Each structure stands twice: as C-alpha cells, then as structure tokens.
UniProtKB/Swiss-Prot annotation:
Keyword Protein biosynthesis carried by entry: yes
Xref: CDD domains: EF1B
Any single Pfam family the record assigns to this protein: EF1_GNE
Gene Ontology molecular function terms on file: translation elongation factor activity
Function: Promotes the exchange of GDP for GTP in EF-1-alpha/GDP, thus allowing the regeneration of EF-1-alpha/GTP that could then be used to form the ternary complex EF-1-alpha/GTP/AAtRNA.
Protein name: Elongation factor 1-beta
Keywords: Elongation factor, Protein biosynthesis
SUPFAM superfamilies given in the database record: eEF-1beta-like
Similarity comment: Belongs to the EF-1-beta/EF-1-delta family.
Length: 91
C-alpha cells in the first residue's frame, strides 16, 4: 500500500431504495482513480429503506489529489443520486 496520509469520506446516495447496493458498490470502486486507495465501504441506513454508501478513500496531501474529483466521478455512475465529500482527515 502506498504511503497515504489522508482519508476522505464520500457519502453516496442511490437514486432509490430498490438499487442493488452490491452492484452499485462495485461500479463505484471501478471509477476510483488508481492513485487513490480504498480503506473500506460502510452502509448507512437513511430512511424508508434508503441506504447510503460511505467510501473511505485514501489519498495524499499533495497536488493532484482531489476528493471532489472522486465525488464527481461517482456522480456520473448510473443509479447515483448524489455523492458528497463529508470529511477529509489526516491519518
């Protein structure tokens, strides 16, 4: 694993509760640029059966690493209603 020193949490909301979260998670993992790492993915129940995916994305505190870039890529995936960077922290 590369020497990452940041973790960004990106919360992804699916378009509706009937979206297959396993398939959506795999599609989202596939669009993360290679320079980033992935620590884990959590599922967060929201309401009325809707579940958000929280991606813990690893990066570096240097030019070329933008969590907004990753969120923008997530928003382009089918069945994604929204993707927002919640936090970025040093590790």
């Amino acid at each position: 694993m590369a020497d990452y020193n940041l973790v960004g949490v990106i919360k992804v909301m699916p378009t509706d509760p009937d979206v297959n979260l396993d398939e959506l998670e795999e599609k989202l993992k596939a669009v993360i640029p290679e320079k980033f790492g992935l620590a884990k993915v959590e599922r967060e129940p929201i309401a009325f059966g809707l579940v958000a995916l929280k991606f813990y994305v690893l990066g570096r505190d240097e030019e070329g690493y933008s969590y907004d870039e990753v969120a923008d890529l997530f928003r382009q995936v089918e069945n994604v209603e929204s993707a927002e960077v919640e936090t970025v922290s040093r590790i």
